[in-house]
Amino acid sequence: MTTPEPQAAFKRVMLKISGEALMGDQGFGLHPPTVERVAREVQSVHALGVEICMVIGGGNIFRGLQGSAQGMERTTADYMGMLATVMNALAMQSALEGLGIHTRVISAITMNEVAEPYIRRRAVRHLEKKRVCIFAAGTGNPYFTTDTAATLRANEMSCEAIFKGTKVDGVYDKDPAKFADAKRYDTVTYDDVLAKRLGVMDASAIALARDNNLPIIVFSLDEPGGFRGILAGEGTYTRVQD
């Protein structure tokens, strides 16, 4: 007799991860074993029947702000960063489909040969069919981060929460890598995140989540089974919500 899957806490979620989460220890680019490990985390949540949206940053390949700081025109640098997110999305799509999970890459910048254009109703239909939707190219506009893009798409897709996968198991009052006495919050309000500059997401993303009462769950992507554990009512994390 097989053990039934636990009931998931959410029906539809947005998973936001940085591009750096896919580069492993190599310091740049994509590390295929790391991409596959993250894909398996997504697979374990997909098995619970959860509808999954994803947004992946592009910082492992190119950061628009860094390019701008080095003299490149900001708009051009941001577009380059958006293209980097498409590369990461395609890598994740390949890994997920290798695990048998139907996946769609949906780009805010039209590139029909490699990704679908963003059409909200079509994306919702993909989710209803249990396809993972990876939203790429940010919002399609410069000056907006992938955190803001993830929050925007999460609202448009009627996600019940954003899961922000990081290197630490929640939000701390100070950097736990530098301060042994750093304390983790179980819950924290949007306004406290902004006022204390806790670095969960950029201010625009936090404000957009707050204005739409969209919870943000901050957890460690490096913890095996952490994503699934939270959805099954376990694990360590911080919940950002009023």
UniProtKB/Swiss-Prot annotation:
The UniProt keyword set, sorted, is: Allosteric enzyme, ATP-binding, Cytoplasm, Kinase, Nucleotide-binding, Pyrimidine biosynthesis, Transferase
Q: Which cysteines are joined by disulfide bonds?
A: none
Among the GO molecular function terms of this UniProt record, one is: ATP binding
**How is this protein activated or inhibited?**
Allosterically activated by GTP. Inhibited by UTP.
Enzyme Commission number(s) from the entry: 2.7.4.22
Q: Which InterPro entries match?
A: AceGlu_kinase-like_sf (IPR036393), Asp/Glu/Uridylate_kinase (IPR001048), Uridylate_kinase (IPR011817), Uridylate_kinase_bac (IPR015963)
* Gene Ontology terms: cellular component: cytoplasm
- Residues involved in ATP binding: 16-19, 59, 63, 166, 172, 175
Point out the coiled-coil segments of this chain. Answer: none
Family note? Belongs to the UMP kinase family.
Name listed for the protein in its UniProt record: Uridylate kinase
Q: Tell me what organism the protein belongs to.
A: Roseobacter denitrificans (strain ATCC 33942 / OCh 114)
